[in-house]
Amino acid sequence: MNHIHEHLKLVPVDKIDLHETFEPLRLEKTKSSIEADDFIRHPILVTAMQHGRYMVIDGVHRYTSLKALGCKKVPVQEIHETQYSISTWQHKVPFGVWWETLQQEHRLPWTTETRQEAPFITMCHGDTEQYLYTKDLGEAHFQVWEKVVASYSGCCSVERIAQGTYPCLSQQDVLMKYQPLSYKEIEAVVHKGETVPAGVTRFNISGRCLNLQVPLALLKQDDDVEQLRNWKQFLADKFANMRCYTEKVYLVEQ
């Protein structure tokens, strides 16, 4: 377990970039929970980028909450490319006016035609599937993606469903499916100072550290030297009680 020690770090909040936007309601819930606990339970998962910067691949709402709570640095676990794969979340959304609006948007060339190329966006309602293809959208496909997700995420409850699973849908449900981006595509978006829609990209990560419970007081310290000393002692105390499970486990989240 020695390698985990090297990958747990304290990183200044201004050295971290986000690849996706946050969901306001979820952010408030996460922030309130962290504030009530007075600690951050799980470290934020990041990948290293150029010039000493990091990109969050899991923990956008935790990072944004810590920043809002006045933390100078945040606890991260650096994840390497061999530890993750990228997929997407499907969105199960209640049928509503947003669907009608998307149907009538002339800049969205919906089609029921199936092609050799995978559709960029798939919208399922009843027995009908409609598609948007990257080739038809051209360079505007990222803007279209943002527009489609924004059409329902601000007004409806969204249930995230793992890619490749087939939920039971009623006539009152719409299932939105999205094609995953590659890491290089996501990194390119971040380098331009942009983000992808919230709650769509999913990093499937192995070897994550859970239940570290880093106190907010440690993260808010102004003295960098003292903070680093306290961080090292904190990790030493935690590692004395750390276990690594190699077998499959089932965790019930509270």
UniProtKB/Swiss-Prot annotation:
Catalysed reaction equations from the record: L-serine + ATP = O-phospho-L-serine + ADP + H(+)
Pfam families recorded: ParBc (PF02195)
Regulation acting on activity, per entry: Binds heme and heme binding inhibits DNA binding.
Annotated active site: E20
Keyword field contains Kinase: yes
GO annotation (BP), single: chromosome segregation
EC number: 2.7.1.225
This protein's name: ATP-dependent L-serine kinase SbnI
Organism: Staphylococcus aureus (strain NCTC 8325 / PS 47)
